[in-house]
């Protein structure tokens, strides 16, 4: 079968190759991947900066954001049936008793990222216990479930932390970034009735800006406009340290900033002491969030349906490019105006 692979640690080793077909063991399912989303983590792996092949393999099959059809069942599987549409979660625990999304580094494997093959292949396998069923009517947008699950966990942490301390949900939110995660965060917050301001570097006539405004949010062009005001909740979805700091500065007293990005190492920031003192005196909270649990995937599917029905098909407009498997290389190169690029493995 064909699969999109890399040699972890070797830059620009991306290729489409023939690999052996996997066979499901007890408790596993054989999947027929249909659509696979591409994200910044894939780019890091392709550049040789991250990723680990499964034990005994010299290559890693990419693809951790997937919509698939169940092709065959391993022994003992009874929670799904052949032909079901499903989304597999990403992470699998290794000797970790915590919820899988809270397992520390070294205590988990991740499909298409770390120690487990992904789903950018004509067939893949995963554990049946980590599958979420997808309604047929969400087939065209369910590939957004995994990135949205990350948002769901982050928003849950932010909103529940705010409510636990101040007794009511946040009314205003600042979303830093208008890529897939930023726009999905804006979508979820809009569905929750929170007033949104989103900041990114694209101009006001860009698709990203128009999508924020379509949600009823205010868009700030960070290149030409100054961000002002205070916000109850900040969702940082860029991975830029300077914006994470700006988010902390813009928190209202008692506010919560949720960090969803992965940041490059930097030196000490100017004015850091004053910023931290302000955080103490105003009871500000900063929380990091990574990965997601099954309930976040389930909530993501519910929000995709709600947004599709009530926001005039908004989720579909986040998918800006669909690339067939034969032209796989095009899926891993995107422009500033692309939002979610998807690899169509098969129809």
Curated annotation (Swiss-Prot):
Catalytic reaction(s) noted: D-glucose + NAD(+) = D-glucono-1,5-lactone + NADH + H(+); D-glucose + NADP(+) = D-glucono-1,5-lactone + NADPH + H(+)
Name of the protein: Glucose 1-dehydrogenase
Thermal behaviour (record text): Highly thermostable with a half-life of inactivation of 10 minutes at 103 degrees Celsius.
GO biological process, one term: non-phosphorylated glucose catabolic process
Source organism (scientific name): Thermoproteus tenax (strain ATCC 35583 / DSM 2078 / JCM 9277 / NBRC 100435 / Kra 1)
EC id: 1.1.1.47
Keyword Hydrolase: no
Co-factor requirement: Zn(2+)
Binding, substrate: 41, 110, 146, 291
The keyword Translocase belongs to this UniProt entry's keyword annotation: no
Positions annotated to bind NADP(+): 178-181, 260-262, 289-291
InterPro entries: ADH-like_N, Glc_1-DH_arc, Glu_dehyd_C, GroES-like_sf, NAD(P)-bd_dom_sf
The organism's place on the tree of life at top rank: Archaea
Keyword annotations: Carbohydrate metabolism, Metal-binding, NAD, NADP, Nucleotide-binding, Oxidoreductase, Zinc
GO MF, one annotated term: zinc ion binding
């Amino acid at each position: 079968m064909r699969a999109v692979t890399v040699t972890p640690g070797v830059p620009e080793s991306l290729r489409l190759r023939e690999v052996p077909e996997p066979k499901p063991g007890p408790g596993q399912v054989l999947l027929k991947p249909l659509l696979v989303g591409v994200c910044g983590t894939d780019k890091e792996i392709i550049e040789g900066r991250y990723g680990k092949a499964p034990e005994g393999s010299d290559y890693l099959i990419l693809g951790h954001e997937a919509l698939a059809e169940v092709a065959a069942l391993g022994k003992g599987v009874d929670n799904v049936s052949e032909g079901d549409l499903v989304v597999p979660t990403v992470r699998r625990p290794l000797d970790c008793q915590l919820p899988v999304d809270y397992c520390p580094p070294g205590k988990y494997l991740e499909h298409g990222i770390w120690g487990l093959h992904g789903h950018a292949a004509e067939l893949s396998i995963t554990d049946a216990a980590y599958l979420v069923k997808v309604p047929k009517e969400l087939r065209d947008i369910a590939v957004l479930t995994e990135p949205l699950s990350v948002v769901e966990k982050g928003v849950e942490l932010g909103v529940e932390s705010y409510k636990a301390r101040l007794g009511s949900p946040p009314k205003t939110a600042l979303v830093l970034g208008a890529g897939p995660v930023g726009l999905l965060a804006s979508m979820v917050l809009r569905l929750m009735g929170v007033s949104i301001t989103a900041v990114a570097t694209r101009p006001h006539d860009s698709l990203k800006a128009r999508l924020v405004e379509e949600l009823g949010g205010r868009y700030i062009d960070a290149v030409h406009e100054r961000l002002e005001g205070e916000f109850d909740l900040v969702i940082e979805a860029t991975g830029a340290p300077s914006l994470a700091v700006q988010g902390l500065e813009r928190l209202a007293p008692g506010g919560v900033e949720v960090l969803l990005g992965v940041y490059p190492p930097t030196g000490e920031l100017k004015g850091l002491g004053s910023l931290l003192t302000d955080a103490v005196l105003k009871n500000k909270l900063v929380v990091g969030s990574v990965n997601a649990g099954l309930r976040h995937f389930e909530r993501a599917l519910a929000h995709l349906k709600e947004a599709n029905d009530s926001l005039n098909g908004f989720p579909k407009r986040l998918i800006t490019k669909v690339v067939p498997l034969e032209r796989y290389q095009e899926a891993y190169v995107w422009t500033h105006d692309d939002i979610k690029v998807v690899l169509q493995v098969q129809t």
